[in-house]
């Protein structure tokens, strides 16, 4: 069983040069091609392309100019610790021990507009490039065209050694759109997290993001190899609702605060 997450805009860029556990992104040559293209954009062009403020656009111009290879712990950081958004608040990677991190390395993947597919311990340098960006490139009109079948191929390769070839989709719609569903090996399950208030259940973006991280952590901590035990997930007060669920969409609800 394999789970996928989206990345985060908020980053912790503090480096740990002595970090022992690290790997390199598997699609790095494709990343290098994108970096070369993005280095040709000035702040105004980047602001227009990514809908960024002038300050953020300038920051990312500097980031792309500063990219340098090869990646080492002295100039890059493991993806699981670099990303700091709501999903990663729920994941709490900083409190995982080495065995948990090694399990995550085998059973968790992070989709990325710049890196394609990341393993948790893959070294990355800071960036901003969302999967939905309409970046015209040599392969098509956007990043979905650029990554093509690379994403699903890497996910299939990752799950090949697992006894249970089920993908748990904890990514956003924007990011998972890059995975060609028809070519995905095995079953697909997308957990849906809803808040119940006044008798009505709704998806609240912030809460759903954190819940996705909490479920990923639950899967890692429990060393889950098959999806059925995920129905016992109850972190944060969520409860699985079989009557609201389907084979491919598992609904979890909790009472809104």
Curated annotation (Swiss-Prot):
InterPro entries: YaaA (IPR005583). One of its GO terms (biological process) is response to hydroperoxide. Disulfide bonds: none annotated. It holds the Pfam family H2O2_YaaD. GO terms for cellular component: cytosol. Belongs to the UPF0246 family. PANTHER family: PEROXIDE STRESS RESISTANCE PROTEIN YAAA (PTHR30283:SF4), PEROXIDE STRESS RESPONSE PROTEIN YAAA (PTHR30283). This is UPF0246 protein Mmc1_3117. It comes from Magnetococcus marinus (strain ATCC BAA-1437 / JCM 17883 / MC-1).
